[in-house]
Amino acid sequence: MPISLGSKGSCQIGGNIATNAGGLNVIKFGSIRNNILGIEAILPNGEFYDDLKTVKKNNTGFDIKQLLIGSEGTLGIITAATFQIHKKTNDRVVIFLHSTHLMYC
C-alpha cells in the first residue's frame, strides 16, 4: 500500500479513508483519495452503498465515493474499500557534500 502513515500501529483503514489521510509518501503517491478505486458504505438513512466495481472511471451522476472520502463519518460509515497498488521501488538517492566552511553548505 503506498500510504505510509506515522501512526500505522494504531490507525485503521476506515478512519484513514474518512479523514483522507496523506501520510509520509503523499508527494509521491498522493493522498488516500487518489489511491481508492471503490468503496462500500452504510449511509445515514440505512441504505447500503456499493461502489466496489472493477470500472476505474465512471462519469455517470455524482461520485458518492469521493464525497465519502474525507467526510469524517458524517455522510456514512465505510465498511470496505478497494485500493490501487503501486509497484515497490528500491530507489535510493545519496548526496555527499564537502566544503571547507560550514556557511557555504
Regions found by a protein language model. Give the residues of each.
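FAD-binding subdomain of flavoenzyme oxidoreductases
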Residues: M1-C105
